[in-house]
Every structure is written in structure tokens, then in C-alpha cells.
């Protein structure tokens, strides 16, 4: 795997932040409230999987993964109802 450029790292980290926000908002009921449970679950599952793949990359620098890891834990524990 080729290391990502600083610009790519920044873009990926920003995208991860969007996934963190979406997972958090769906779980809190602030996003996708009008969607059915399967749609909400699918959204959380996809974004959680994305974060798991991204956090596993080995070319991160000093970026904090605290919020990302919290969102992964929350997403993995989420069951839409």
C-alpha cells in the first residue's frame, strides 16, 4: 500500500468525521428519524464499517482517533428499533 499524501490524509480524516457525526446523529434520533429501522441500521452499519477500515490504516500521524473509536463502539452496539 502506498502512503497517502498529507492532502489525502486530511480528506480521509474529514470524511471520517462526517461518518462519526452521522452515526452519532442517527443513534440520537437527530438524523433519519423518518426512515424505517432497516434504513437507519444500514446507515449506521455502513458508516461503522467505513470507520473500522479507515482507522486500521497504518499511515496516520498524530490524528486523534478517540471520537472515531467511540463512534465505532456505539455503531457496533446499535440496534435500530
Stretches found by the model and what they are:
Residues 1-81:
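Beta-rich interaction/scaffold domains
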Amino acid at each position: 500500500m502506498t502512503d497517502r499524501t498529507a492532502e489525502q490524509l486530511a480528506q480521509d480524516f474529514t470524511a471520517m468525521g462526517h461518518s462519526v457525526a452521522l452515526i452519532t446523529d442517527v443513534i440520537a434520533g437527530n438524523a433519519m428519524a423518518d426512515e424505517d429501522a432497516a434504513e437507519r441500521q444500514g446507515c449506521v452499519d455502513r458508516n461503522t464499517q467505513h470507520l473500522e477500515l479507515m482507522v486500521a490504516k497504518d499511515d496516520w500521524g498524530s490524528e486523534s482517533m478517540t471520537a472515531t473509536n467511540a463512534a465505532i463502539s456505539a455503531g457496533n452496539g446499535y440496534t435500530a428499533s
